[in-house]
């Protein structure tokens, strides 16, 4: 767990970087048993075609570059690619968009990912307070975080009881619990993720400055959750 994650962190720091690309961040999460999609990093078009075939169409493509952390601004995320022909076209387009956005961008490759079925969007974040150390944050994604600031915080490490309270304390909890005849979300999967993030950060507190799992798709009770996008900033 820790050894595997540390190896990735040390490689990033050795390159003089503190911002991990999404692929690296997800590898760290995966080392701690967090649910990430079955994605593969393609360095060539041939690899991209091979991985898309293995994963099964439709797929998503995301260009990985340490200079392009806001991928949607740079138009380097392509969704719902349905065929090899379309993938070839999008491969050219995604690289062209990256060059326009940051001509000096170093490109690590393109992440080929399955198209995920949408779930309830939640966000899990970590920040470091100079006085109290690392804190973990939880809330519903989108408007709830951005506009309503409906989030809860706890100092790391957290207990299972803390994780459950973090979830029930948000104002939007009824949405997760299954208000108005909606199917309840998989609360146990969220509890598990909060505990695993807490353990990860507690183990690696000397290295991690902040972390953002946004969005996380949470499915119906018993169906789990998956980290759709992730960002980790390391201490320099």
Swiss-Prot record:
Any idea where the ATP-grasp domain is?
A: 26-62
Which key words tag this protein in UniProt?
ATP-binding, Ligase, Nucleotide-binding
This enzyme catalyses:
acetate + ATP + CoA = acetyl-CoA + ADP + phosphate
Q: Name one GO molecular function term.
A: metal ion binding
The residues the record assigns to binding ATP are 52-63
Temperature effects?
A: Optimum temperature is above 90 degrees Celsius (at pH 8.0).
EC category: ligase
The UniProt similarity line reads: Belongs to the acetate CoA ligase beta subunit family.
**General function of this protein:** Catalyzes the reversible formation of acetate and ATP from acetyl-CoA by using ADP and phosphate. Can use other substrates such as phenylacetyl-CoA, indoleacetyl-CoA and isobutyryl-CoA, but not succinyl-CoA. Seems to be involved primarily in the degradation of aryl-CoA esters to the corresponding acids. Participates in the conversion of acetyl-CoA to acetate and in the degradation of branched-chain amino acids via branched-chain-acyl-CoA esters.
| Protein name listed in UniProt | Acetate--CoA ligase [ADP-forming] II subunit beta
Q: Which organism is it from?
A: Pyrococcus furiosus (strain ATCC 43587 / DSM 3638 / JCM 8422 / Vc1)
Q: Which gene encodes it?
A: acdBII
């Amino acid at each position: 767990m820790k050894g595997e994650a540390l190896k990735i962190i040390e490689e990033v720091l050795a390159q003089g970087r503190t911002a991990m690309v999404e692929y690296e961040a997800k590898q760290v999460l995966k080392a701690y048993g967090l649910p990430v999609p079955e994605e593969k990093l393609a360095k060539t078009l041939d690899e991209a075609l091979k991985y898309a075939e293995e994963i099964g169409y439709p797929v998503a493509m995301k260009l990985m570059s340490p200079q392009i952390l806001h991928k949607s601004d740079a138009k380097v995320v392509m969704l719902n690619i349905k065929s090899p022909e379309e993938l070839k076209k999008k491969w050219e387009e995604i690289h062209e968009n990256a060059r326009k956005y940051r001509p000096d961008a170093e490109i690590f490759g393109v992440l080929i990912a399955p198209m995920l079925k949408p779930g309830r969007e939640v966000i899990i974040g970590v920040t470091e307070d100079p006085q109290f150390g690392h804190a973990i944050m939880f809330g519903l994604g989108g408007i709830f975080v951005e506009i309503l600031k409906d989030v809860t915080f706890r100092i790391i490490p957290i207990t299972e009881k803390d994780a459950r309270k973090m979830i029930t304390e948000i104002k939007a909890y009824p949405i997760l619990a299954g208000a108005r005849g909606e199917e309840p979300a998989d609360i146990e999967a969220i509890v598990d993720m909060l505990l695993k993030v807490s353990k990860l950060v507690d183990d690696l507190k000397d290295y991690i400055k902040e972390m953002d799992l946004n969005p996380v798709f949470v499915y119906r009770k018993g169906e789990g959750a998956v980290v759709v996008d992730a960002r980790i900033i390391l201490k320099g």
